[in-house]
Regions:
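Glycine-rich adenosine-cofactor-binding loop
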Residues: 127, 131-159, 172-177
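Short acidic low-complexity segments
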Residues: 191-206
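Rossmann-fold NAD(P)-binding glycine/threonine-rich loop
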Residues: 225, 230-307
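N-terminal ligand-binding/catalytic initiation module
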Residues: 1-120, 128, 138, 292, ...
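NAD(P)-binding Rossmann-fold cofactor-contacting core
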Residues: 161-186
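C-terminal helix-to-coil terminal segments
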Residues: 310-350
């Protein structure tokens, strides 16, 4: 019998390593059987309410279905923020029989960090797949842009895949926020975290750069990058924000030079780069600096169809450019399996 899972019943069920493994399988399966995954679809009301739909599945986990979330989106001072976010709703069906398994209300939370924001867990687990294939295996240092919940989740994913990292430099616009972040998470994660006063200090001396903000503006100059570094960015954006008059131009966090200098660019889905005209990659494509076909997909790396990092001097760039139903359902299915084993949830008679 299917069950209903509420937010409090999703707490403490899934760890970051398990989530990264599941999301990796989601992208691998989506590459080998493309019709089981699809880009997100979004609609906007004139008042700024956005509804995002994420259809997809992970056949290896026995799940297919969709996720939906609604939020009141605002743009101010170069940042996107959410005046209100409703709990997401995921519908899980058996990918072999079509039978309903569960209706899941709320965010799946990570064991270590607890409640997430902006789908931070799935986003970080997706970055984690990129870290697995693109970050130098002997990486020792990282630069982190952002000091909120998304940044904490991204850092945990990085440390999960590269436990060799012992030093992190964090930059955000608010000095007090970055100081508090460094104090809290250096203790929690057991690494040195140093708040820095300028973006360049989080870029030049490190092996890995992770952008975990909600900005609409470029965070650093791509000319600051040096050989061997990896960059992850998480701002996707969608053309409807411009078409609806919410933004004058596409959202960006990374500049043209970053894309131009990268030896390997990876996106979650190439289709979303063009269909949503996502600024960080679409603008340099339009300007003739890079080509869409040179961008690898995350699932191609996971399936072994394209290589990840192959040399110590490569600059690699993962554009975690949008969520997918397959990734959402991978993490949600893990939570469902654990919850069911623990006797959580309310049976639904249908």
């Amino acid at each position: 019998m299917p069950i209903l899972l509420r937010p409090r019943e999703l707490e403490g069920l899934v760890d970051m390593k398990s989530a990264i493994d599941a999301v990796c399988e989601a992208y691998r399966g989506g590459t080998e059987y493309p019709v089981i995954n699809a880009p997100r679809r979004r609609v906007h009301s004139p008042a700024g309410v956005r509804v995002s739909n994420f259809p997809g599945g992970v056949h290896a986990l026995g799940v297919i279905g969709s996720g939906t979330r609604a939020e009141l989106v605002r743009q101010a001072e170069g940042n996107q923020h959410y005046e209100f976010r409703e709990h997401p709703v995921h519908v899980l069906n058996d990918s072999r029989t079509a039978r309903l398994l569960a209706i899941v209300l709320g965010e799946v939370t990570e064991k270590t960090l607890g409640p997430s924001s902006l789908m931070a867990f799935r986003t970080a687990a997706t970055s984690g797949v990129g870290f697995r294939y693109l970050v130098p295996e002997n990486a020792r240092s990282a630069g982190l842009f952002g000091s909120g919940g998304q940044a904490a989740y991204q850092l945990l994913a990085l440390l999960t895949e590269r436990p060799s990292i012992s030093n992190v430099r964090v930059y955000s616009r608010d000095p007090e926020n970055r100081r508090r972040f460094a104090e809290k998470y250096s203790k929690m994660f057991g690494v040195e975290i140093e708040p820095v006063d300028a973006p360049r200090a989080a870029v030049e001396p490190v092996d890995v750069i992770v952008c975990a903000t909600n900005t609409n503006k470029v965070l650093f100059d791509g000319n600051w990058l040096h050989e061997g570094q990896h960059v992850t960015g998480i701002i996707g954006g969608n053309i409807q924000l411009v078409q609806g008059g919410f933004l004058k131009e596409s959202r960006r966090e990374l500049d043209d030079r970053t894309a131009e200098r990268a030896d390997l660019i990876v996106a979650n889905l190439r289709e979303s780069v063009s269909s949503e005209k996502q600024g960080d990659l679409w603008i340099p494509i339009e300007r003739g600096l890079i080509k869409l076909e040179q961008i690898a997909e995350l699932g191609e790396l996971a399936a072994g169809k394209r290589a990840g990092r192959t040399g110590a001097r490569q600059i690699t760039y993962h554009k975690n450019n949008n969520g997918t139903g397959a990734a959402d359902l991978a993490v949600t299915m893990l939570a469902y399996q654990k919850a069911r084993a623990l006797g959580r949830g309310t049976e639904i008679a249908i």
